[in-house]
Amino acid sequence: MTLKAVFFGSIGSFSETSRLQLDSFNESMKINQIDEIWDEKEYIGYLKISGGINRLKSILSKQMDENILQKIHYDKTKIFQQKILKSRSLIRPGFEQLCEELLANNVLLGIASTTSLQTIENILLGLKSIKISDFNFIAHSGTVNKQKPDPQVYKICLEELNVQEIESVAFEDTTSSLNSVISAGIKGIAIPGNLSLNQDFSMAQIKLNEFSDIDFKGLKELL
């Protein structure tokens, strides 16, 4: 089977941002006068819920109006984007090298995220050896109306790149997001971040610590 496309899913699959996001949630809740502070141990559990707004709805919805939740998420996104721009490159080690090898073998690259396009682009500003334009399609919050683990984002990516499920693989960093891959019929690769290491990735084809643990040949063998 020919490997035609590789998808990188949630932003955590190609960048390390979990602690920045935790800080951003806490700052946003403080700004909005919410008497709650999440610690790292709590947030590790919350990462099992895909999508920032879903996280807020699941944890705070019993005591919050929908408009307040949306405002907290909006402020969190703004704060997070500012933190990204102030940080040195957040790109995970080996990501660009793997992308270079895939590009050299004429494999299409896609990002299957449901976060904002601005956030994705801000993170990708940290790229050095490849360019944002090297990605053939970038799915974002404006592309979908369903959050992971719903497979919608992956089905859209497959259609946009005109590839079949069996011709592609996808990287994800959390169990919930990986379920989106599996539901779309794509072979899923787990590459957990610092705060999702202990999640159950038994449904993955393979679990990696870093991108350097696999290459083009290894990805082809997963099909």
Model features per residue range: what roles?
Residues 13, 17, 113, 177:
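Ser/Thr-glycine-rich phosphate-binding loops at phosphate-binding pockets of nucleotides
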Residues 1-3, 116-118, 122-223:
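Asp-based, Mg2+/Mn2+-dependent phosphohydrolase catalytic module
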Residues 69-70, 92, 96, 132-135, ...:
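Short, structured helix-loop boundary elements
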